[in-house]
Amino acid sequence: MKVLVLGSGAREHAIVWKLAQEHPPGSVICAPGNPGIAKIGRCIPLDIANLEAVRSLAVSESIDLTIVGPELPLALGIVDMFAKAGLAIFGPTRAAAQLESSKAFAKEFMAARSIPTAQYQVYSDAPAAIKAVREGRFGFPVVLKADGLAGGKGVIIAPDGATAEQAVRSMLIERRFGDAGIQIVMEEYMEGEEASFFAICDGRTAWALPASQDHKRIFDNDCGPNTGGMGAFAPSPCVTPSLKDRIFGEIIEPVLNGLSEAGTPYRGLLYVGLMLTSTGPKVVEFNVRFGDPETQAVLPMITGELTPILLAAAKGEMGTPKCAVSTWPHVAVVAASQGYPGSHETGFTIGGLEKVEQMSDVMVFHAGTQQVGDDIKTAGGRVLSVVGRGETFDVAIAKAYEAIDHITFTGKHVRRDIGKKALSKSQTS
């Protein structure tokens, strides 16, 4: 069996790392991949937004299953194209992918099906949105979101009216996010603990992976601007078995039923960003693919074979999988370039990788890296994810930080508090 993974980040490295353990050498291909992936799979340079080029690659390589990492190919309709060509692909159709590609669509979908989420209003007219801010329609802080895909940077939490008005102007008048900000969602600010919930879906049924928690802000103690994610841990002590049942009953099942009734059954990975409020779980956002950096913490927990589950889900015939999952805590810490998520320099040599790759219960997943001669150099904002695992969160955290402290490059930035929330929760539970 041959598998194709699309993408070039640490998420895709984690996916390839897992699948490469289940298949003979050379059976897992990644496009375009990165230097870390190239050590365990075959990388083919390719623009994955060019859907026809991806389809041609899948045909020429006799690919049995394609797994889509990032959201853009899904939003462009790669699953629809592959389905017409009779090619198996793990991911939702373009229509179903609107759960992520349009926040307005997602909010309206949830409202129609009574799926718990924040109160909201959609605006495309700046004066109307500013009027809502001045009236304090949703109170303060207030959350403003660009409707379309904005690379994880399209959300602004405004603490007061002046900040909210400026956010409205930057989105709707100055077009800060381009076409992604033609309309915006304004919603109430929710209080509680955030969690990420992954479910593999076959259109009718869903199988949950261990819940995780992300760390979006650039600095310790959740300070500074939002990023794509500076670290994650799993399993989340906040997501108890009873809460998991509520998430399935109040969110996952209504999503699957609603999309099935609309004629667009959801097959693929459904990522539910949750706020665990005092009244129960509420949806912050949907993503239609594996999250980054949560995937780096979650996938190593799956000790059984993942490929058969993904293939069965893609074909709409998953049923109830039987797959072994570790209970050991896993902690993923991101090493980023100085200046990220703003402008940052790249091209610095990365040291310490060989030493870290020999450490037990540690995994290194490449993101913004490039091979230059014999050296690995920085090539992006988020450079690497380092994952530590252990019998307790104390051990997993210590492993992750011991490893990441061996890695060197000019301007390396690391949050020092990844996993501390889990530590406090597990100690008080």
Language-model region placement:
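ATP-binding N-terminal substructure of ATP-dependent carboxylate-amine bond-forming enzymes
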Residues: 1-95
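Active-site "cap" helix and flanking loop/linker of ATP-utilizing ligase/carboxylase catalytic domains
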Residues: 246-270, 287-359, 370-372
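Internal nucleotide-binding/catalytic subdomain
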Residues: 154-295
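Solvent-exposed alpha-helices and their adjacent loops that cap or buttress functional pockets
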Residues: 21, 36-38, 60, 90, ...
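Short, conserved charged micro-motifs
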Residues: 53, 163-166, 342-344, 391-398
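Generic C-terminus detector
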Residues: 369-373, 377-429
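Active-site nucleotide/adenylate-binding loops and adjacent lid/helix of ATP-dependent enzymes
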Residues: 4-5, 99-183, 213, 237-253
